[in-house]
């Protein structure tokens, strides 16, 4: 049946994403969403375009989250960071999770990614903040808390460093584009 074929494709794409060294957290979320959608379909027309959308979503997943070019230590560090991004994440915690010393992690991370651990963390947090600011009306301080930065002034300063505008100005620009 069409459902069985799509469920098989979903499983194959999931396996390919694992081979591309994408964190299981991301893979399983996409896999589960497609499985629920396929299994919940009542009519054949409910499944139109699902195969194409699956290919697109899994390709984007690999494109944005593949860690295939990194050593296992850096993969472990990035996976830990991504899983704890909205908490107070310290270099010591990350190094412990990867089973290496702080100095080794810092040097290796910089060598393999081209940025420091904190630059990576802050970049990811600012990316999340941009999403919140673009689609919600949350107060700026709350957005900062949501991304793991409890100090509103520090959040604004960091956001301005990365985006060349304040969070409030960014939100206004995004609202003007709607």
Please give the residue ranges for each predicted region:
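Inter-domain helical "communication" segments and dimerization helices
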Residues: 1-87, 96-97, 172-178
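DNA major-groove recognition helices of helix-turn-helix
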Residues: 9, 112, 129
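Juxtamembrane/interfacial segments around transmembrane helices
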Residues: 55-62, 102, 106, 128-129
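Short amphipathic helical patch at the helix-1/turn junction of helix-turn-helix
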Residues: 85-86, 133-137
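Basic/polar phosphate-binding segments, predominantly the helix-turn-helix DNA-binding elements
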Residues: 88-124, 138, 144-169
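Short, basic, alpha-helical segments at the C-terminal edge of helix-turn-helix-like DNA-binding modules
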Residues: 121-130, 169-178
């Amino acid at each position: 049946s069409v459902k069985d074929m799509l469920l098989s494709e979903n499983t194959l794409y999931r396996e390919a994403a694992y081979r591309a060294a994408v964190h299981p957290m991301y893979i399983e979320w996409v896999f589960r969403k497609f499985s629920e959608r396929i299994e919940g379909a009542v009519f054949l027309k409910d499944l139109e375009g699902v195969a194409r959308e699956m290919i697109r979503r899994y390709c984007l997943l690999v494109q944005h989250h593949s860690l295939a070019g990194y050593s296992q230590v850096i993969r472990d560090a990035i996976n830990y960071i991504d899983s704890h991004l909205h908490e107070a994440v310290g270099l010591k915690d990350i190094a412990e999770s990867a089973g290496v010393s702080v100095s080794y992690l810092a040097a290796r991370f910089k060598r393999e990614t081209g940025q420091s651990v904190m630059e990576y963390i802050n970049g990811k947090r600012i990316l999340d903040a941009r999403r919140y600011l673009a689609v919600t009306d949350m107060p700026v301080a709350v957005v900062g808390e949501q991304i793991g930065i409890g100090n509103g002034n520090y959040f604004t300063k960091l956001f301005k460093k990365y985006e060349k505008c304040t969070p409030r100005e960014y939100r206004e620009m995004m609202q003007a584009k709607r």
